[in-house]
Each structure stands twice: as structure tokens, then as C-alpha cells.
Amino acid sequence: MKHGNTVGSLTEIQHARIIGSLLGDGYMSCKTHAYLKICHSIHQKEYVDWKYHILSSFVLTKPKAYKGNGKRVGYRFCTRSMEVFTQYYKDFYVDRKKRVPETLVLTPFSLAIWFMDDGVKNRKSLYLNTQQFSLRDQENLLHMLKRDFGFEGNLNKDKKYLRIRLLQESAQRMKSLIQPLIPTFMRYKLPL
């Protein structure tokens, strides 16, 4: 997945932020051109603001709180619908269903974003909640983690769905790799 340096193109940090968000909680929609929606709990307001800061040149409205189902309150922003996002949509969606592009290359920063969105530490393991993806996509993600970082892991059943579990030694190496990239307000995801 390569996105060129044309007018309106993204920096490497913006690109990594989008990749990590799409592997996590980010969502895209497309009519003529695609847009990215970033949405988290109001308790992660600082995290949404942090993501917004990097993508603000593509956003018209600052993040806002909204009321979800029941008592849930979220905090979100959307980028503008732009051609620069359309290739991401084509890469990550088939028939409006999110998938993992086989050409995806992970970077430490995209991995850090993905972990902040959908990662959890439990005992000596790190988990990536990949339940939204098909079995094939999850296997591809395991392959990418091994190819790009040398991390060993497996698919672990969480209730009735599978998710990625990094083995202890790989979990330690991943923690060392991404911890410097994680802002202090998200460090609770990676306790010492």
C-alpha cells in the first residue's frame, strides 16, 4: 500500500495513523470519495483530540461529543470526503465490509495506534482484538506481525470470537517497540 506525495497527500505519520485506526476502531464510508470517521468513548477524549491534531488539515469540524445507544457518550470527528482517502477505502473495504489488505505493511507507529484502539495487556500477554475481521484476515495479520517485526502469536478464543495473542517474548518486544510512541494519557493500556 503506497500513497504518493501528490497535492493533498498524507505525511507518513498521517498514513500510519489511518492504517492503525482502520485496523482498530476507525471506520470509512464512500460515495464519490471516501471519508474516515474516528470515534471513541468520551473517556478517551484526549486520545481523539490527539488523533484529530494529526489529521486536522483534512477535517472541517473539531471533535464533538455525541450520545449513543443507552447511556453511552462518545467523542468523534470525521475527515472531509476526499480523493486522498478513497484508495484506503478501496484497500480496506469490499462490499462495505472491512478487511485487511494483503499488501499492508505495518510500521511501529501504525502498530501503536492499532494497539491503543484495540489492544489489551493481560498478565504477560498482549492481545489485539481482531474479532471484526475474518479468519483469513486474522491469519494475514499474524503473518504481517511476524514478517514486519518478528513477533510470534496465535489466534486465541475470547468468548466466541478469535483475537490475536502475542506470545510472551514477542509481547515484551512489542511493548518495548511501541511504548515510546504512546502518549502518556494512553499508557494505562501498557502497564509496567
Predicted regions and their residues:
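Internal intein/HINT superfamily modules and their associated LAGLIDADG
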Residues: 1-192
